Regions:
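Periplasmic alpha-helical coiled-coil/stalk elements that build and connect Gram-negative outer-membrane
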Residues: 3, 9, 34, 144-256, ...
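Bacterial N-terminal signal peptides
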Residues: 11-22
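Bacterial Sec-pathway N-terminal export signals of envelope proteins
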Residues: 26-76, 80, 86, 230-272, ...
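Acidic, low-complexity, intrinsically disordered peripheral segments
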Residues: 27-29, 85, 412-449
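Small/polar-residue-enriched beta-strand and adjacent coil segments characteristic
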Residues: 35, 74-140, 265-347, 353, ...
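Amphipathic alpha-helical coiled-coil segments
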Residues: 52-67, 141, 145-166, 175, ...
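Metallo-beta-lactamase
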Residues: 211, 262, 416
Length: 449
């Protein structure tokens, strides 16, 4: 048998290493230039909160199947073997007849409920409604996750843009510091101007450090929101919005919320489920009618083996339970009233949340328009102060103040632009995406009812 040479083995080993490194690099690269759509897609797959909400559906599907199982007969196989003392005291007193000592039994018993006050039917309907309610909860969780990811995404953009502004401000102050130092050595400015310029450079350096740390924090927040492993490095591609449309009419948005918000839909389904559970509890007032049958074989050491069977229609009517059924009905009715009040409270809360998000978006939109003018004004003021300072017609404080005003207005413009996108995403979350989150039943059990 021919064996591969050492050279072939080495080439094969190098090829495997290169393939592994390329795959690892590709896997790492996948998270280095994520758009907002990419982040949302990753979060829908990796976020543990959304995965847990989806898995809850499997639990409720199992509840539905458990409730539906009562529509089918219940078969029980029973078997035993026992030994008894031959001199035992027989029923009715002592007898000269020899008693059996060993007994074996094997039998099958079956029970089919014919009527149980419709408890099984309503329990099945309640379980089915609960599954639909959980699907709305999954959609609500998905919408909330989309908002959280969008917020983290634009906060990272904000941190990056702030870092650019801070670095540009540092460069401007360093250049001004060099100019002031030259003027100070030439005797054109005082020591106070020189020291103040150096102080402004130190403050700008501190701002750059804080901006860099803010970028690291924003990346970590985004990575954890997506649900990625701690070893994965995340970065994004994106920029601040350039167009800022109005949020829309508040009344129209509210009417859309009432139709599409998944939380409201879930509350409606929970109320319907609770009303069905009242009918389940009231079913205990009615008798249960069932068909029962059994077939068995008994073997005794005296008498031999004998098959037996029994069958009949049975009715059970609990005419006294100490108030159990009445208490169950009262509990179910109370839960329904609680859900009605909860829905009323959540409608008020959602209306406030929508109004707040609408206000934030509109304020940010107006803030962008105003701050753009402020930035243009401060740029002109800074350039003018710098030109006058070079010609000795302005003091250093004028230039430094112009730098501070310009940097502050740029920060404010970034803040308003990000606030606009976050407010817009918040409105979208409250309104609801009106798209069903995909659900795949688990392999361990459960299917869509």
């Amino acid at each position: 048998m021919l064996l591969p040479s050492k050279g072939c083995k080495l080439i094969l080993l190098v090829g495997v290493i290169i393939l592994w490194m390329s795959q690892a690099a590709a896997a790492a690269k996948d998270y280095q230039a994520l758009s907002l759509e990419d982040c949302l897609a990753v979060a829908r797959q990796q976020n543990p909160v959304l995965s847990g909400a989806r898995e809850k559906i499997n639990e409720l599907v199992a509840d539905y199947q458990a409730a539906r199982s009562k529509f089918f007969p219940r078969l029980v196989l029973t078997s035993y073997y026992d030994r008894q003392p031959p001199n035992r005291f027989a029923p009715g007193g002592s007898t000269p007849i020899e008693l059996f000592k060993r007994e074996g039994y094997t039998g099958v018993l079956g029970k089919q409920i014919i009527f149980d006050g419709l408890k099984t039917y309503y329990s099945t309907q309640a379980a089915k409604t609960g599954t639909q309610s959980q699907k709305q909860e999954v959609q609500r969780t998905a919408d909330e996750l989309a908002f959280t990811v969008t917020q983290a995404f634009y906060q990272l953009i904000e941190a990056k843009e702030n870092l650019k502004v801070a670095q540009e401000a540092l460069q401007q102050r360093q250049e001004f510091g060099k100019l002031t130092e030259a003027f100070y050595q030439a005797g054109k400015v005082t020591n106070l101007d020189y020291v103040r310029a150096k102080s402004q450079v130190s403050e700008a350096e501190q701002a750059v450090v804080e901006a860099q740390n803010a970028v690291r924090l924003a990346k970590e927040i985004l990575s954890r929101t997506l649900g990625l492993n701690e070893q994965v490095q995340v970065d994004i591609k994106g920029k601040l919005p350039q167009e800022f449309a109005a949020a829309g009419d508040m009344n129209s948005l509210w009417q859309e919320v009432l139709k599409t918000n998944p939380e409201i839909k879930k509350l409606d389904l929970d109320i319907a489920q609770s009303q069905t559970l009242i009918k389940v509890a009231r079913g205990s007032y009615l008798p249960e009618v069932s068909l029962q049958a059994g077939s068995d074989v008994k073997h005794r050491d005296l008498g031999g083996t004998k098959p037996e069977w029994i069958g009949g229609v049975f009715m059970e009517y609990p005419f006294f339970e100490g108030g159990l059924t009445r208490a169950q009905v009262a509990k179910a009715s109370s839960q329904t009233l609680q859900l009605l009040e909860k829905k009323r409270d959540r409608l008020n809360g959602i209306k406030v949340d929508l109004t707040t998000a609408w206000k934030d978006q509109e304020n940010a939109r107006q803030g962008v328009a105003t701050t753009r003018q402020t930035v243009a004004t401060n740029e002109e003021a800074y350039a003018s102060a710098q030109a006058l300072y070079r010609h000795g017609k302005a003091i250093g404080l004028d230039v430094l103040q112009g730098q501070v005003d310009l940097t502050g207005s740029r920060f404010q413009l970034i803040r308003y632009a990000v606030a606009y996108e976050i407010g817009k995403a918040r409105i979208k979350q409250i309104v609801g995406s009106n798209q069903s989150e995909s659900y795949q039943p688990s392999r361990s059990g459960g299917q869509k009812p």
